């Protein structure tokens, strides 16, 4: 992509500098290949597996198989494709993996739409996923499509191998601005979606330029007219962006993208086109935090979160943040936004950003019309009994006000008593941060208090030392 002067928007020296930091190394591929071989051998030599489901295939999938993994990702995805009905795979998958991996490799289980094992060895990880062996991607559901996605991307990159670098750049860009990942924690762009967009638009700069002009609802037809976009719009009415899956055009591969993450990409793309900077790319971002924190209220939770699926914990945290934000606004506090965090092990937190964790000392109340005699009498007695005020407005209804002596922390405590907490939570406490200064939290929790992305402060000069 060229700018008005005919020069590339991404300077060549910056492109080279970023790629030098994010390209996977030969050593990385070699070691990950060895990890895959160890896992594949454990599965292929597993007698219990051969006796239970004789026909199966072990397949390397995902970014490592496509050559599109970032240098800091020492992970492989291994699918155990079983020639058996989906129900049987779900019934036997976990026990078979335990039998095949036990005693040979260190592993632990995670639970998503399929239970899967994570082998952890020498700082590397291999996710081992049992799935039914599907012949047609239209018969696959969820992660079962991953082998088809891998084959599709590999075939396109064999035709245009130079796009590998552009995919790496785009993934690093998405990661740098905080919108990379389809999991609930992020609600952003999956690695596969990033690859599909680069293949469709023909490069990193072309994709960023296209994104800069997006306005919801966004439609990006990556299927050369094979997809029924009207049908997809009806099927995914809440999706701000629809990108048909090239291997199954009836599916929106951008279904995980939230309005917030789409808007963040559009905003970042426009700023990047105006002011390219290494700070947009995750591998070149400054190590020192760049923050200007806001006052507010922090809810600190502790529990056993590792016993629950991460998406379940993150999803509940997000809903808790939304409801506390609405509750504090409804109580008259100048709430601005919210953020949330969990280490997926022992702690979680929600922070409500506010102009100030205080509110007006008077609270208004709308009452009934006087002809609703009992209600009107109760309303009047209650307001005056509180040392407040009562009057009749121009609309003929009773109105009132009362002194308000509550606190933001107290109101959040009362709201928490009625709201579902993340699964595994054992206890919590509420802390008020009255100013923009430090509130005594560890750095990763203080980061929740600044709703402005660090990259944005660095790029546009809002970061003060």
Curated annotation (Swiss-Prot):
GO terms for biological process: RNA repair; tRNA 3'-terminal CCA addition. Pfam families: NTP_transf_2 (PF01909), tRNA_NucTransf2 (PF09249). Its cofactor is Mg(2+). GO terms for molecular function: ATP binding; CCA tRNA nucleotidyltransferase activity; magnesium ion binding; tRNA binding. The keyword tRNA processing applies. Its EC number is 2.7.7.72. CTP binds at residues 63, 66, 149, 171, 180. ATP binds at residues 63, 66, 149, 171, 180. Mg(2+) binds at residues 75, 77, 127. It catalyses: a tRNA precursor + 2 CTP + ATP = a tRNA with a 3' CCA end + 3 diphosphate; a tRNA with a 3' CCA end + 2 CTP + ATP = a tRNA with a 3' CCACCA end + 3 diphosphate. It is an enzyme of class 2 (transferase). CDD domains: NT_2-5OAS_ClassI-CCAase. Keywords: ATP-binding, Magnesium, Metal-binding, Nucleotide-binding, Nucleotidyltransferase, RNA repair, RNA-binding, Transferase, tRNA processing. Belongs to the tRNA nucleotidyltransferase/poly(A) polymerase family. Archaeal CCA-adding enzyme subfamily. A single active site specifically recognizes both ATP and CTP and is responsible for their addition. Homodimer. Catalyzes the addition and repair of the essential 3'-terminal CCA sequence in tRNAs without using a nucleic acid template. Adds these three nucleotides in the order of C, C, and A to the tRNA nucleotide-73, using CTP and ATP as substrates and producing inorganic pyrophosphate. tRNA 3'-terminal CCA addition is required both for tRNA processing and repair. Also involved in tRNA surveillance by mediating tandem CCA addition to generate a CCACCA at the 3' terminus of unstable tRNAs. While stable tRNAs receive only 3'-terminal CCA, unstable tRNAs are marked with CCACCA and rapidly degraded. NCBIfam families: cca_archaeal. This is CCA-adding enzyme. It comes from Aeropyrum pernix (strain ATCC 700893 / DSM 11879 / JCM 9820 / NBRC 100138 / K1). The lineage of its organism: Archaea, Thermoproteota, Thermoprotei, Desulfurococcales, Desulfurococcaceae. The gene is cca.
């Amino acid at each position: 992509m060229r700018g008005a002067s005919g020069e590339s928007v991404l300077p060549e020296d910056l492109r080279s500098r970023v790629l030098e930091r994010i390209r996977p190394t030969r050593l990385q591929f070699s070691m990950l290949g060895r990890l895959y071989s160890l896992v594949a051998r454990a599965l292929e030599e597993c007698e219990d597996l051969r006796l239970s489901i004789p026909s199966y295939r072990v397949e390397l999938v995902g970014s490592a198989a496509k050559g599109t993994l970032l240098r800091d990702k020492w992970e492989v995805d291994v699918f155990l494709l079983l020639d058996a009905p989906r129900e049987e795979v779900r019934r036997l998958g976990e026990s078979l993996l335990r039998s095949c991996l036990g005693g040979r490799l260190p592993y632990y289980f995670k639970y998503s739409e399929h239970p899967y094992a994570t082998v952890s060895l020498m700082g590397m990880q291999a996710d081992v996923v049992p799935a039914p062996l599907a012949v047609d991607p239209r018969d696959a559901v969820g992660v079962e499509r991953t082998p088809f996605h891998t084959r599709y991307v590999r075939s396109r990159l064999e035709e245009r191998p130079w796009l590998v670098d552009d995919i790496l750049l785009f993934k690093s860009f998405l990661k740098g601005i905080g919108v990379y990942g389809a999991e609930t924690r992020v609600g952003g762009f999956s690695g596969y979606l990033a690859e599909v967009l680069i293949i469709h638009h023909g490069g990193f700069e072309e994709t960023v330029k296209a994104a800069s002009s997006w306005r919801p609802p966004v439609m990006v037809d990556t299927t050369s007219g094979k997809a029924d976009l009207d049908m997809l719009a009806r099927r995914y009415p809440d999706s701000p962006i629809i990108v048909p899956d090239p291997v199954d055009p009836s599916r929106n591969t951008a279904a995980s993208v939230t309005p917030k993450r789409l808007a963040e990409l559009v905003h970042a793309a426009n700023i990047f086109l105006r002011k390219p900077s290494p700070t947009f790319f995750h591998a070149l971002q400054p190590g020192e935090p760049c923050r200007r924190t806001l006052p507010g209220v922090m809810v600190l939770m502790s529990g056993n979160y590792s016993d629950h699926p991460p998406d379940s914990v993150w999803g509940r945290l997000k809903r808790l943040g939304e409801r506390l934000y609405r509750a504090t606004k409804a109580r008259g506090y100048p709430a601005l936004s919210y953020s949330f965090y969990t280490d997926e092990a022992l702690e979680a937190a929600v922070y409500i950003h506010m102009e100030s964790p205080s509110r007006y000392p008077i609270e208004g109340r709308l009452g009934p019309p006087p002809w609703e005699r009992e209600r009107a009498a109760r309303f009047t007695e209650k307001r005056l009994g509180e040392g407040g005020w009562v009057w009749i407005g121009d609309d003929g209804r009773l109105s009132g006000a009362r002194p308000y002596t509550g606190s933001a922390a107290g109101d959040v405590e009362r709201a928490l008593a009625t709201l579902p907490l993340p699964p595994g939570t054992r206890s919590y406490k509420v802390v008020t941060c009255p100013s923009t200064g430090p509130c005594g939290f560890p750095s990763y929790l203080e980061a929740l208090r600044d709703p402005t992305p660090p990259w944005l402060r660095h790029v546009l000069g809002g970061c003060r030392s």
